[in-house]
């Protein structure tokens, strides 16, 4: 997940209301993204799942 280093034309712009980019990974396999997309509030990470969030609405 890249927040501020956008690589055109592959970046994603999140819609209003869900304007944070996020990526979810399993802590056991941190290099394998499970899910990524847009969300309104960054979820808290748990023992098994780690969330990375951008504070912008554009990300790669």
Swiss-Prot record:
GO CC terms: extracellular region; membrane; other organism cell membrane
Keyword Aminoacyl-tRNA synthetase belongs to the record: no
GO BP term (any one): killing of cells of another organism
Molecular-function GO term, any one: toxin activity
Domain of life, per lineage: Eukaryota
PROSITE patterns: SNAKE_TOXIN
Xref: Pfam families: Toxin_cobra-type
CDD domains, A to Z: TFP_snake_toxin
Subcellular location: Secreted; Target cell membrane
Keywords: Cardiotoxin, Cytolysis, Disulfide bond, Membrane, Secreted, Target cell membrane, Target membrane, Toxin
Disulphide bridges, residue numbers: 3-21, 14-38, 42-53, 54-59
SUPFAM superfamilies tied to this protein: Snake toxin-like (SSF57302)
Cited function: Shows cytolytic activity on many different cells by forming pore in lipid membranes. In vivo, increases heart rate or kills the animal by cardiac arrest. In addition, it binds to heparin with high affinity, interacts with Kv channel-interacting protein 1 (KCNIP1) in a calcium-independent manner, and binds to integrin alpha-V/beta-3 (ITGAV/ITGB3) with moderate affinity.
Homology family: Belongs to the three-finger toxin family. Short-chain subfamily. Type IA cytotoxin sub-subfamily.
Complex formation: Monomer in solution; Homodimer and oligomer in the presence of negatively charged lipids forming a pore with a size ranging between 20 and 30 Angstroms.
Name the UniProt record assigns to this protein: Cytotoxin 1
């Amino acid at each position: 997940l890249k927040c501020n280093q956008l690589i055109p034309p592959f970046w994603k712009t999140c819609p209003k209301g869900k304007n944070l980019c996020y990526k979810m990974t399993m802590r056991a396999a941190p290099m394998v993204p499970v899910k990524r997309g847009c969300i309104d509030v960054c979820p808290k990470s748990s023992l098994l799942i780690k969330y990375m969030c951008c504070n912008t609405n554009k990300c790669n």
